């Protein structure tokens, strides 16, 4: 009986340690520069450098309320160190911050930057922030929104 209890305890310890999750920390997901992506006729952008494709028609509709506003446009995307994606385009008033969830980009934050729409936004890494430059205006963003 005593041997049975010892064996059961050993198996329990082994079972518990085998079920613990593995977490790799100090990971940096940041892209060094933004991707400027042409939108195809179906509303998709493909970034071969980072191996993803996404349909952005819903994003352009959210921004403009026009289902064809993506035509002949480019989307600007960059990823920060935590793995959040920042997306905007010329004419957008907002920057959209997404996280990946179950195979989809899920909106985390929508940040209003220019009531009239940005002319030529450009994004860069400025750790721990993403910097957005639009003409003379510069903004620092993180996954929670605009740095105050």
Positions of the model-derived regions?
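Sec-dependent bacterial lipoprotein signal peptides
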Residues: 1-20
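Bacterial Sec signal peptide processing site at the extreme N-terminus
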Residues: 17-33
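Beta-strand-rich domains and repeat architectures in extracellular enzymes and scaffolds
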Residues: 36, 60-86
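Beta-propeller fold detector
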Residues: 46-64, 106-115, 148
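Repeated scaffold domains used in trafficking and secretory/extracellular systems
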Residues: 69-78, 115-127
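Conserved beta-strand positions in repeat-built beta-propeller and related beta-rich domains
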Residues: 87-91, 131-136
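Structural signal for beta-propeller blades
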Residues: 94-95, 138-139
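Short loop/turn segments that connect beta-strands within beta-propeller blades
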Residues: 99-103, 143-146
């Amino acid at each position: 009986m005593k041997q049975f209890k010892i064996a059961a305890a050993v198996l329990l310890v082994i079972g518990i340690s085998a079920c613990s999750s593995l977490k790799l920390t100090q990971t940096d997901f940041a892209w060094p520069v933004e991707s400027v992506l042409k939108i195809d006729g179906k509303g998709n952008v493909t970034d071969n450098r980072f191996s993803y494709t996404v349909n952005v028609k819903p994003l352009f509709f959210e921004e403009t309320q026009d289902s064809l506003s993506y035509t002949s446009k480019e989307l600007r995307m960059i990823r920060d160190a935590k793995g959040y994606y920042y997306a905007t385009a010329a004419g957008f008033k907002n920057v959209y911050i997404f996280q990946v969830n179950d195979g989809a980009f899920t909106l985390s934050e929508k940040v209003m930057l220019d009531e009239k729409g940005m002319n030529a936004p450009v994004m860069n890494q400025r750790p721990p922030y993403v910097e957005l430059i639009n003409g003379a205006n510069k903004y620092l963003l993180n996954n929670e929104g605009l740095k105050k």
